[in-house]
Amino acid sequence: MSRVAKKPISIPKGVEVSVQSDMLTVKGVKGVLTFPKSDNVNVVMDGDILTLSANDPSHISLAGTVRAILSNMIKGVSIGFERKLELVGVGYRASMQGKDLNLTLGFSHPLVFVPPEGITLLTPSQTEVVVQGIDKQRVGEVAAKIRSFRPPEPYKGKGLKYAAEAIIRKEAKKA
């Protein structure tokens, strides 16, 4: 069996998990998340412990994937997820206009990004953007979408980068 799927999930206080025949629902302080349940994976709830197992040896990897997704759902509705982005470059700025993100990235026009449902954007400073939400996948997708407007270039390092990202720099061409 998958090492990931073998590890049981403990449910923290304030989080409710309901297992139906075709759907897994996780309710918490921050919101509600649902995930379609596969018939090939058994989910057993014993008090505040969830255990997963595969029906067939060929579905062991699926059990590990479902366990990781379920664990992230529980963490999301209790704590939440966030991704931080930094703007590096002269004149690169970020500001909030209501719920929309206004980006000045050296183009002839400012970029306006409207966040999808369930995602909160914050700008603690003009050179920082924080993406928050309860769904880990959507937070990552939105952060990647914002970063794609001006990814960091390797010569000067200008652009939008993740806070912990290390940009591999290239040396300029010598004459």
Swiss-Prot record:
Stored InterPro entries: Ribosomal_uL6-like, Ribosomal_uL6-like_a/b-dom_sf, Ribosomal_uL6_a/b-dom, Ribosomal_uL6_bac-type, Ribosomal_uL6_CS
Transmembrane segments: none
Pfam families, per the entry: Ribosomal_L6 (PF00347)
Signal peptide: none
One GO cellular component term: cytosolic large ribosomal subunit
Keyword presence, Aminoacyl-tRNA synthetase: no
GO molecular function, one term: rRNA binding
Function: This protein binds to the 23S rRNA, and is important in its secondary structure. It is located near the subunit interface in the base of the L7/L12 stalk, and near the tRNA binding site of the peptidyltransferase center.
Protein name (Swiss-Prot/TrEMBL): Large ribosomal subunit protein uL6
Organism from which the protein derives: Xylella fastidiosa (strain M12)
Source species taxonomy: Bacteria, Pseudomonadati, Pseudomonadota, Gammaproteobacteria, Lysobacterales
